[in-house]
């Protein structure tokens, strides 16, 4: 009888790597799906759904990501200031100009399942507007998702 081996937390921590992706010209949804799979560890042979076995990801040039269709005009993001009448509405065009890092971060977060483990996974994503970042010490490997 064949025994199934499960990945332990210590083994997963030893195998973590840092990756960097240039988001310039990439479609937002496709970028978010690939990023979510990478930080979950679904690209690994020893993927275990109940363990945090994913890698770290740095996304640069988030201000050059592409929104397809009419999402720039017809899609809105809402937040509330907790005061009466304090609902704020931001269009895709404004979100891409002012808070593109938050736009990409929320897209990746939306591709993850809603559980306790996803709160640990989302901490592995680091999004930057330009091509400069402060993660050089980790020596990230470049991924080409174009």
From Swiss-Prot:
SUPFAM superfamilies: Ribosomal protein L13 (SSF52161)
Annotated GO MF terms: mRNA binding; structural constituent of ribosome
One term under GO cellular component: cytosolic large ribosomal subunit
NCBIfam families, A to Z: rplM_bact
Subunit structure: Part of the 50S ribosomal subunit.
Job description of the protein: This protein is one of the early assembly proteins of the 50S ribosomal subunit, although it is not seen to bind rRNA by itself. It is important during the early stages of 50S assembly.
Protein family: Belongs to the universal ribosomal protein uL13 family.
Name of this chain's protein: Large ribosomal subunit protein uL13
Organism field: Mycoplasma pneumoniae (strain ATCC 29342 / M129 / Subtype 1) (Mycoplasmoides pneumoniae)
């Amino acid at each position: 009888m064949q025994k199934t081996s499960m990945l332990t937390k210590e083994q997963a921590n030893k195998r973590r790597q840092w990756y960097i992706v240039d988001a310039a010209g990439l479609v937002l949804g496709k970028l978010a799906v690939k990023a979510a799979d990478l930080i979950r560890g679904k690209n690994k042979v020893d993927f275990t759904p109940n363990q945090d076995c994913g890698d770290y990801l740095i996304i640069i040039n988030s201000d050059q990501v592409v929104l397809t269709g009419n999402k720039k005009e017809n899609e809105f993001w809402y937040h509330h200031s907790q005061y009466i009448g304090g609902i704020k509405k931001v269009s895709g065009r404004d979100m891409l100009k002012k808070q593109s890092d938050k736009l990409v971060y929320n897209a990746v977060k939306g591709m993850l399942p809603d559980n306790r483990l996803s709160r640990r996974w989302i901490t592995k994503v680091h999004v930057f507007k330009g091509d400069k970042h402060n993660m050089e010490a980790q020596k990230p490997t470049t991924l080409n998702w174009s």
